[in-house]
Design a protein with these regions (language model features):
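Phosphate/ribose-recognition catalytic cores of enzymes acting on nucleotide-derived substrates
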Residues: 88-211
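Classical nucleotidyltransferase
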Residues: 1-98, 124, 179-183
């Protein structure tokens, strides 16, 4: 595809890069291929930060283990994905924390560790901060994984079936099973306060938020 569609004069590849069926293509294969097709090849070494190699594998592990800030730093951008707003149980609204239930568009979407996150969503070009819970909602005895976000500011109507972009900025805490709904609401208020403090920093700019 690369050769047919782009006719490259030079290919830049990482030293440990693999590709193709069952990752059978490696740098040695690429060297032979480029030589036979009169294409220049530049092999670059690993990018490091404090002797730690920055790689896609490491970034995936960071996301899956909840180290979102570090993952975003290594990505050089904010980890996020597209999701469709789907119908939920309506419980959040009863708790005075209405949420939009999200279904990732990609079937095999990489998802973060279960927990509560400070997020930013792009909805019809509008940027809205919020707090997101990814988990099974153990307080209510449920077992299905649910991704839901409470957006700060005025409640947005008619979000169902909309496609939004959701970014994970900070991990706030683990998902907890509370002994009562009142205890859950009390914690949600603390989470919101925490997220609003972070929101103020992010509104000053991404660099300020990481200091």
């Amino acid at each position: 595809i690369l050769i047919k569609n782009f006719n490259p004069e030079c290919i830049v590849s990482g030293k440990n890069h693999t590709f193709g069926h069952n990752r059978s293509g490696d740098i040695n294969y690429l060297k032979k291929f480029c030589t036979n097709n009169n294409i220049a090849l530049e092999v670059v070494g690993p990018l490091k930060d404090c002797e730690m190699v920055i790689s896609s594998t490491n970034i995936r592990n960071l996301i899956e283990n909840g180290f979102i800030r570090r993952a975003n730093y290594e990505l050089g951008s904010i980890y996020g994905f597209y999701a469709k707003v789907v119908s939920g149980s309506g419980r959040g609204k009863k708790l005075k924390y209405p949420t939009a239930n999200l279904m990732p568009l990609e079937k095999d979407q990489l998802l973060p560790k279960i927990g509560v996150y400070f997020t930013r969503c792009i909805i019809n070009g509008l940027s809205r901060y919020g707090m997101c819970n990814f988990g099974i909602r153990p307080t209510f005895g449920e077992n299905d994984l649910v991704l839901e976000v409470h957006l700060f500011g005025e409640e947005l109507n008619d979000l169902y079936d909309n496609c939004i972009w959701v970014e994970f900025l900070e991990r706030i805490r683990d998902e907890i099973k509370f002994s009562s709904v009142e205890e859950l609401i009390e914690q949600l208020e603390k989470d919101k306060s925490n997220c609003l403090s972070l929101k103020s920093k992010y509104e000053l700019g991404e660099e300020d938020a990481y200091n």
